[in-house]
Swiss-Prot record:
Family: Belongs to the universal ribosomal protein uL10 family.
Record gene name: rplJ
Protein name: Large ribosomal subunit protein uL10
Domain of life: Bacteria
Source species: Nitrosomonas eutropha (strain DSM 101675 / C91 / Nm57)
UniProt record, GO biological process: translation
NCBIfam families: PRK00099.1-1 (NF000955)
GO molecular function: large ribosomal subunit rRNA binding
Amino acid sequence: MSHNLEEKKAIVAEVSDQIAEAQAIVIAEYRGLGVGQLTQLRVKARESGIYFRVIKNTFVRRAVVDTPFSGLAESMVGPLAYGIGSDPVITAKVLHEFAKDNDRFVIKAGAMAGTVMSGKDVAALAALPSREELLSRLLGTLQAPVAKFVRTLNEVPSKFVRGLAAVCDKK
């Protein structure tokens, strides 16, 4: 598909805007996947807040220049799809789960905060719990001592009432 110069500039600008707000980029080769499969992935990515698109590598190379993701430029070879997201774990997790179900979708590389990752590193990132899971674990850990203290304080009057009830039952 041929683009005129204005369309090319618009695509590069759109990708640059997404990259400016991104915390992570995952690159995957999609050779041999059907349109239906890619559409399913696009829907899931959109629901997760991930910008997922098949873009010409030259457009993305121009968009990542002078960004923390510029190290990815050498990995941009072949037919690639790009997942750009604000949460590195969710971005890696959504694309990795799709790759597990579809052998023809292969994660090639990724980047976050100036660090370029291999496909294996992206898989390891996908294995981490999400931000919400980590926050709920932290909240549970912080809440446990307080809850235990409250139960202990509540036990003293309860024990007294049970003792009075036992005395009343004897009489």
